Design a protein with these regions (language model features):
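Flexible "cap/lid" subdomain of the alpha/beta-hydrolase fold that forms the substrate-access gate
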Residues: 23-28, 39-40, 52, 88-126, ...
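A short loop-to-beta-strand scaffold at the N-terminal edge of the catalytic core in hydrolase folds
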Residues: 36-44
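N-terminal export signals
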Residues: 5-22
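Conserved HGGG/HGGXW glycine-rich cap/lid loop of the alpha/beta-hydrolase fold
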Residues: 45-93
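Catalytic histidine-centered segment of alpha/beta-hydrolase-like enzymes
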Residues: 301-309
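C-terminal alpha-helix
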Residues: 316-324
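Residue-level recognition of beta-strand->loop/alpha-helix junctions
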Residues: 84, 297-299
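Short acidic-hydrophobic surface loop/beta-edge motif
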Residues: 29-35
Length: 325
């Protein structure tokens, strides 16, 4: 299987900026890799022979959230790969018939498929929000492919069967956008006002982060992907059982319904100022991490942990890769 993966990685089509230009600008290379369902755009930095680190963004964010995390990893000799999730940036579906699903199994399968396309037997995984969900899924279901895991916001695998249980009213209030997306008005609102709506979520979820308009706009361009709205709407409906999933992914969803533990060395980062996934002093998810595990609370940091706390994020990755987990 791995020999096949290596061949796929070598054969994978890539649209790449000239190396000399990339060195002059200091920008990561933008490449593309084909899987069975997607052409995944991703940014790559560091030596091709370095241990790979895949860094996965969330909703509504994009690879810019890792701009200050990547340099210390590259300086330490690691190969940093930052994909655009399905529905974001230059990532595209290969076939019109493929369901525009944002369900958790799709995100996990996309990450695994990307590793196969790049010929990576294993990698360190980093993620938050949707990207943390993808990373947690691969770590839980295919631990042999994962060297270590840094997950912001905790054990990100959804408990879909438990979604019918109401949360405390204050938390229900924080999840207003999810219930909005359950309606056709919400779909229309996201389509018509995607930048304004996503900027509001940034502000609500990271109340202590004083980002400027230019910072937001650098990421907001990724939301103009033609499949962004459909992928987002399906994601937030599926997790409550209000939309069917992709039949091709049902076997993965059944495995995830069992709440599989994560056995690989892991560090969870949680912002104490997160306006949507509120942090508690008690670690209610520790039992879901059965390998070497730490949880770190970061004062004043909101939901976008890697962009708001890049030093802490990079330090956690380096600690695990150097055997400190």
């Amino acid at each position: 299987m791995l020999d096949r993966c290596l061949l796929l990685g070598l054969a994978s089509a890539a649209a790449i900026a000239p190396p000399a230009l990339a060195q002059q600008t200091g920008k990561p290379l933008l490449k593309r890799a084909s899987t069975s369902t997607l052409e995944i755009a991703y940014e790559e930095s560091g030596p091709a022979t370095g241990v790979p680190v895949l860094l996965m963004h969330g909703f509504p964010y994009d690879p810019r959230c890792y701009d200050e995390v990547v340099p210390p990893l590259v300086a330490a000799g690691y190969r940093a790969i930052v994909p655009y999730l399905r529905g974001y940036g230059e990532t595209r579906f290969l076939a019109a018939s493929t369901p525009r699903s944002g369900q958790q199994a799709a995100l996990g399968q996309d990450l695994l498929d990307l590793m196969d396309a790049l010929g990576l037997p294993n990698a360190a995984l980093v993620g938050f929000d949707w990207g943390g969900r993808a990373a947690c899924i691969v770590a839980a279901l295919w631990p042999e492919r994962v060297r270590c895991l840094v997950s912001a916001n905790g054990y990100n695998i959804q408990d879909i069967a438990g979604s019918v249980r109401p949360a405390p009213p204050e938390q229900e209030h924080r999840l207003w956008y999810q219930y909005y997306f359950h309606t056709e008005r919400g779909r229309a609102g996201l389509a018509a006002n995607r930048h304004a709506l996503c900027k509001l979520l940034w502000q609500l979820w990271s109340p202590n982060w004083r980002f400027d308009d230019a910072t937001f706009e650098r990421s907001a361009a990724s939301f103009d992907n033609p499949d962004f709205v459909e992928v987002v709407i399906q994601s937030y409906r599926h997790r409550y059982g209000y939309a069917p999933g992709d039949p091709a992914l049902e076997a993965i969803e059944q495995r995830l319904a069992a709440r599989p533990p994560i056995t690989v060395p892991s560090i969870v980062l949680q912002g104490e100022g997160d306006g949507v996934a509120t942090a508690t002093r008690a670690d209610t998810q520790a039992h879901l991490f059965t390998g070497p595990y730490q949880r770190r609370l970061i004062p004043r940091i909101g939901h976008d942990v890697p962009q708001e706390a890049p030093q802490e994020t990079a330090a956690a990755v380096l600690e695990l890769l150097r055997g400190g987990g």
